[in-house]
């Protein structure tokens, strides 16, 4: 009898050990998930990072007007610190902000903006990226990367944890898969939106009680481009013939459109834009030091006519609707085409009207 009892005791002891081990494992497993212990903590060298590589490229980007793929969720574990040099004017910094946000998400990194960019954009938009403190910026072992102005495959697999981007990226190929998120980041503050809508409400056509049904924002880029484009880039800015053709395009497709003109050259606009049809309103203040009033006005319109430049691009991108842009505005041998790809600059559904390059041929004659 004794040997049998001894075997029973041994089996019972082993069973208790197994049950205890299972109970302990289940307790630890449950507690780990209760406290957020995931693979990123258990394997700190291999953070749980989701790379939405499939949506960075053109085939994964929505091609129909004003649509977007669902905003990708933030990866479960973001690491590193990425930022971008704030350079250029208002539209340039919008492009830099959107590109930083998109590339950081794509590579599972935390994005921060520098104080100068916050100072330029935060008074206008409800941006959410945190600001990098100057002392952190000064002590971070940055690797620097200058971006060209279109999305490239290598930008989807950047392994640097501390990366400072630079350049003037403003291409939809970087961020169009995040269209709704970008539009949310660039939501106007209420007072700017309400002021712009108030201006539009005051516009009338014909009889005082008739309100126009369709507003077309018109941005005419002039200023320094009058010299830069022909002298440096063998290019032109939009002329009166282009603006007339663009307006006629909308007149043929929309009932009683009203053209709301803004520019950093309002005097030229008043002297050169045909107002004989009574549907053109000069509403911009042309103040380059405070561009947000004109920008807010353009984004509240239904459609857009742009000439060249990032200011017009962003106004059109945020307004939605139809967009007409100035196409082929440089000579074929322009150096500008080495840094600018039209197919990456203008959305496929936008409508291009070719520029008149004859003034450049005149300049080229001996």
Swiss-Prot record:
Source organism of this protein record: Alouatta caraya (Black howler monkey)
Gene Ontology biological process terms from the UniProt entry: carbohydrate metabolic process; fucosylation; lipid metabolic process; olfactory bulb development; positive regulation of cell-matrix adhesion; positive regulation of endothelial cell migration; positive regulation of endothelial cell-matrix adhesion via fibronectin; positive regulation of sprouting angiogenesis
Top-level EC class as recorded in UniProt: transferase
Gene Ontology annotations for the cellular component aspect, listed alphabetically: Golgi cisterna membrane
Intervals, Lumenal compartment: 26-366
Subcellular location: Golgi apparatus, Golgi stack membrane
Glycosylation sites: 66, 302, 328
Pathway of action: Protein modification; protein glycosylation
Family: Belongs to the glycosyltransferase 11 family.
Catalytic activity, as annotated: a beta-D-galactosyl-(1->4)-N-acetyl-beta-D-glucosaminyl derivative + GDP-beta-L-fucose = an alpha-L-Fuc-(1->2)-beta-D-Gal-(1->4)-beta-D-GlcNAc derivative + GDP + H(+); a ganglioside GA1 + GDP-beta-L-fucose = a ganglioside Fuc-GA1 + GDP + H(+); a beta-D-Gal-(1->3)-beta-D-GlcNAc-(1->3)-beta-D-Gal-(1->4)-beta-D-Glc-(1<->1')-Cer(d18:1(4E)) + GDP-beta-L-fucose = alpha-L-fucosyl-(1->2)- beta-D-galactosyl-(1->3)-N-acetyl-beta-D-glucosaminyl-(1->3)-beta-D-galactosyl-(1->4)-beta-D-glucosyl-(1<->1')-N-acylsphing-4-enine + GDP + H(+); a neolactoside nLc4Cer(d18:1(4E)) + GDP-beta-L-fucose = a neolactoside IV(2)-alpha-Fuc-nLc4Cer(d18:1(4E)) + GDP + H(+)
Highest taxon listed in the record's lineage: Eukaryota
GO-annotated molecular function: alpha-(1,2)-fucosyltransferase activity; galactoside 2-alpha-L-fucosyltransferase activity
CDD domains on file: Fut1_Fut2_like
Chief location of this protein within or outside the cell: Golgi
A Pfam family: Glyco_transf_11
Documented EC number(s): 2.4.1.69, 2.4.1.344
Official protein name in the record: Galactoside alpha-(1,2)-fucosyltransferase 1
Sequence ranges on the Cytoplasmic membrane side: 1-8
Membrane topology qualifier: Single-pass type II membrane protein
Role according to the record: Catalyzes the transfer of L-fucose, from a guanosine diphosphate-beta-L-fucose, to the terminal galactose residue of glycoconjugates through an alpha(1,2) linkage leading to H antigen synthesis that is an intermediate substrate in the synthesis of ABO blood group antigens. H antigen is essential for maturation of the glomerular layer of the main olfactory bulb, in cell migration and early cell-cell contacts during tumor associated angiogenesis. Preferentially fucosylates soluble lactose and to a lesser extent fucosylates glycolipids gangliosides GA1 and GM1a.
